[in-house]
From Swiss-Prot:
Binds 1 [4Fe-4S] cluster. Keywords: 4Fe-4S, Chloroplast, Iron, Iron-sulfur, Membrane, Metal-binding, NAD, NADP, Plastid, Plastoquinone, Quinone, Thylakoid, Translocase, Transport. The gene is ndhK. SUPFAM superfamilies: HydA/Nqo6-like. It is a peripheral membrane protein. It catalyses: a plastoquinone + NADH + (n+1) H(+)(in) = a plastoquinol + NAD(+) + n H(+)(out); a plastoquinone + NADPH + (n+1) H(+)(in) = a plastoquinol + NADP(+) + n H(+)(out). Its cofactor is [4Fe-4S] cluster. Belongs to the complex I 20 kDa subunit family. Its EC number is 7.1.1.-. It is found in: Plastid, Chloroplast thylakoid membrane. [4Fe-4S] cluster binds at residues 43-44, 108, 139. NDH shuttles electrons from NAD(P)H:plastoquinone, via FMN and iron-sulfur (Fe-S) centers, to quinones in the photosynthetic chain and possibly in a chloroplast respiratory chain. The immediate electron acceptor for the enzyme in this species is believed to be plastoquinone. Couples the redox reaction to proton translocation, and thus conserves the redox energy in a proton gradient. GO terms for molecular function: 4 iron, 4 sulfur cluster binding; iron ion binding; NADH dehydrogenase (ubiquinone) activity; quinone binding. This is NAD(P)H-quinone oxidoreductase subunit K, chloroplastic.
Amino acid sequence: MNSIEFPLLDRITQNSVISTTSNDLSNWSRLSSLWPLLYGTSCCFIEFASLIGSRFDFDRYGLVPRSSPRQADLILTAGTVTMKMAPSLVRLYEQMPEPKYVIAMGACTITGGMFSTDSYSTVRGVDKLIPVDVYLPGCPPKPEAVIDAITKLRKKVSREIYEDRTGSQQETRCFTTNHKFRVGRSIHTGNYNQGLLYQSPSTSETPSETFFKYKSSVSPHELVN
């Protein structure tokens, strides 16, 4: 169930002593201990939440959902990522310890989905913010597809060399855009613009001569109506 082929972990002597490397040992220890950070922003997360149930039981893969990025090594971005959420997503990724992995789940996360054509506030692909290891297309992907993506990620982890991954991440390091706020003149002075207010004339303020003059000029038929 959790068997992954190791190209370098096959040197077994006659005395049943396994000869391997530190990279292979580290990769093997992380295969069944991927702790995902739940980052759901849309309907794709509902499909991922069904994996927690007894039907799919993703605990057999060693997946333990975490609510803190400092305790997670995998983040599943499920749903639409907006411009306002982009700095928060990058900050969560930076707070995760190395080595860390990203699975982009759903069409909205990969390309923007239905919001990619005429939306002014949607990120066209989460890979513009953080590096993605596995792309999982669908709208939304089925739970079986999520399990397949996790299996592919575990195969990638088993063949990984830590030094190479660290070097590649340094070359494609993401960055956080700082928001700049400019303090302008306050428009809340406490005084209302009287020119914008509509003041309807009251009957008490209307002179009696004008009122009776207007009443005498109106026909009885108009008064009835």
